[in-house]
Amino acid sequence: MTDPSRLVTPERRGDDLGDAALRPQNLSEFVGQQQARANLQVFIDAARKRKEALDHVLFVGPPGLGKTTLAQIVARELGVGFRATSGPVIAKAGDLAALLTNLEERDVLFIDEIHRLSPSVEEVLYPAMEDFQLDLIIGEGPAARSVKIDLSKFTLVGATTRAGLLTNPLRDRFGIPIRLNFYTIEELESIVTRGARVLGTPITADGANEIARRARGTPRIAGRLLRRVRDFASAADAEAIDRAIADHALGALEVDSAGLDAMDRRYLTTIALNYGGGPVGVETMAAALSEPRDAIEDIIEPYLIQCGYLQRTPRGRLLTDHAFRHLGLAAPSRDPAQFGLFGDTGDQE
């Protein structure tokens, strides 16, 4: 199974609880996602001026890019209450009803992993989002009756890493869909520099750059790497985190110059050496690495594709020449027909 303790996993880990102090508190402090942030500011200002609930918001993007942080900022900027839960936690319609009936006017309800809601819960959510009403069935059999409960006008903020798993009726009820993208190195430098300041740790510009370059475009990983590099700097009695300290620390932690760790290199090396660089189907890779398909598609591959090391083609996964150069291997000569014209068309074996 994918090791949840991977330093560069974008998924939330137990030690990320310390990130709360590093999180921006409002949109002006939030770095990156410029267009999404600007649009969100307009929608928030308009709702606040009209004294109305903000339209329902859907954040889509890989883990660790700030979906939860933005949801909290939305509530803070609106000056309303904030309740948070996740799709798997809402097991039955009654759980959702309890959450919704306790919301005050214009409050924000945040549902992480909203694509994992059960169909029965989704059915209850539709009228709640559209008409601010709950349609519940009370009792069973011939004695069962339908009850309508009026709700306060609230804002649902959903977050998902798998937009394709959302049902169309649910997706269509979000008036403000926002896609979050990986961050640039410059944006991550700003995040690392701010984080070091919050932690009271001096850092040089080249030290922040070294951490940012290896943070895989993800603020959550940048904060995690910063905390670990800070440990190395403290142990060495360094006055500040500079490039040399950061390079030594991240090398010791097996995070290479491109932000790849042992799992990433194992994935790339398996395709390169065992399958001639590909194409190879994702199910074959799942068996070869003893990893579930979801972990490969959601955790391992996105950053490798973003970096240009991997292509999803109609015939399967294919390493690029860039990947071979990074591994220090000679790229094989390949028929151009192996490359798909339009990327991924699903799993191919």
Curated annotation (Swiss-Prot):
One of its GO terms (cellular component) is Holliday junction resolvase complex. Residues 257-349 are annotated as: Head domain (RuvB-H). The lineage of its organism: Bacteria, Pseudomonadati, Pseudomonadota, Alphaproteobacteria, Hyphomicrobiales. Has 3 domains, the large (RuvB-L) and small ATPase (RuvB-S) domains and the C-terminal head (RuvB-H) domain. The head domain binds DNA, while the ATPase domains jointly bind ATP, ADP or are empty depending on the state of the subunit in the translocation cycle. During a single DNA translocation step the structure of each domain remains the same, but their relative positions change. Homohexamer. Forms an RuvA(8)-RuvB(12)-Holliday junction (HJ) complex. HJ DNA is sandwiched between 2 RuvA tetramers; dsDNA enters through RuvA and exits via RuvB. An RuvB hexamer assembles on each DNA strand where it exits the tetramer. Each RuvB hexamer is contacted by two RuvA subunits (via domain III) on 2 adjacent RuvB subunits; this complex drives branch migration. In the full resolvosome a probable DNA-RuvA(4)-RuvB(12)-RuvC(2) complex forms which resolves the HJ. The keyword Hydrolase applies. ATP binds at L22, R23, G64, K67, T68, T69, E130, D131, F132, R173, Y183, R220. It catalyses: ATP + H2O = ADP + phosphate + H(+). Disulfide bonds: none annotated. It is an enzyme of class 3 (hydrolase). SMART domains: AAA. Belongs to the RuvB family. Keywords: ATP-binding, Cytoplasm, DNA damage, DNA recombination, DNA repair, DNA-binding, Hydrolase, Nucleotide-binding. Its EC number is 3.6.4.-. This is Holliday junction branch migration complex subunit RuvB. The keyword Nucleotide-binding applies. One of its GO terms (biological process) is DNA recombination. It comes from Rhodopseudomonas palustris (strain ATCC BAA-98 / CGA009). Mg(2+) binds at T68. Residues 184-254 are annotated as: Small ATPAse domain (RuvB-S). Its main location: cytoplasm. Residues 1-183 are annotated as: Large ATPase domain (RuvB-L). GO terms for molecular function: ATP binding; ATP hydrolysis activity; four-way junction DNA binding; four-way junction helicase activity. NCBIfam families: PRK00080.1, ruvB. It comes from the Bacteria. It is found in: Cytoplasm.
